[in-house]
């Protein structure tokens, strides 16, 4: 609440690169972010970098079970990195949770396919956002899972995803813009 530009927290879960936080620690983190947001008149959100672990969104459901943090303050991102995670994310959104699709993830669920599939499954556009993970680290692993390098994610995939939504998925431009603009603004308050 004291640092002007800080509007919440971000933590990696369900990922081999996370610090493997326990459910109670995650619930406490999300609750502190929520309270800080209330005190500082900010969003007080908790963003979760989702990995490919079979745990999927279980850590977020544990937060909801072990705290009083509203679902509207939790944001799983990178949900299109695997089919099983994306299916779980659609369920999360159908229950009222906001989900974030990463434009820089080429598959297995492309960003434009992810938006289209979510909408076709009944997810409201206002519960979807698309982000680039721009300036985030992009680790490179070999076939054995060894880190071989680290790059930096760019922003160009945002425009590419918007174009694909309109030209490939045949979504009207006004609707295609929502996950990049209005839904993000609403989520961040």
Regions found by a protein language model. Give the residues of each.
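Active-site core of metal-dependent hydrolases
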Residues: 15-21, 25-141, 147-148, 152
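Proteins with a high burden of low-complexity, intrinsically disordered sequence enriched in S/T/G/P/A and R
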Residues: 1-2, 28, 189
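His/Asp/Glu-enriched, well-ordered alpha-helical/loop segment
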Residues: 120-189
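Metal-cofactor-binding active-site regions of metalloenzymes
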Residues: 1-19
């Amino acid at each position: 609440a004291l640092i002007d530009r800080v509007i919440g927290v971000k933590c990696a879960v369900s990922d081999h690169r996370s610090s493997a936080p326990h459910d109670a620690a995650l619930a406490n983190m999300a609750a502190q972010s929520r309270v800080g947001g209330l005190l500082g008149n900010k969003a007080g959100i908790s963003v979760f970098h989702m990995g490919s672990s079979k745990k999927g969104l279980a850590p977020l459901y544990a937060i909801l079970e072990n705290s009083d943090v509203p679902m509207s303050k939790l944001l799983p991102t990178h949900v299109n990195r695997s089919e099983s995670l994306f299916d779980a994310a659609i369920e999360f959104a159908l229950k009222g949770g906001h989900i974030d699709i990463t434009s820089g993830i080429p598959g297995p669920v492309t960003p434009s396919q992810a938006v289209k599939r979510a909408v076709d499954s009944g997810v409201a556009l206002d519960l979807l956002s698309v982000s680039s993970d721009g300036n985030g680290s992009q680790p490179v692993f070999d076939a054995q899972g060894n880190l071989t390098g680290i790059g930096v994610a760019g922003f160009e995939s945002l425009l590419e995803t918007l174009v694909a939504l309109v030209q490939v998925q045949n979504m009207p431009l006004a609707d295609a813009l929502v996950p990049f603009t209005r839904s993000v603004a609403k989520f961040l308050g």
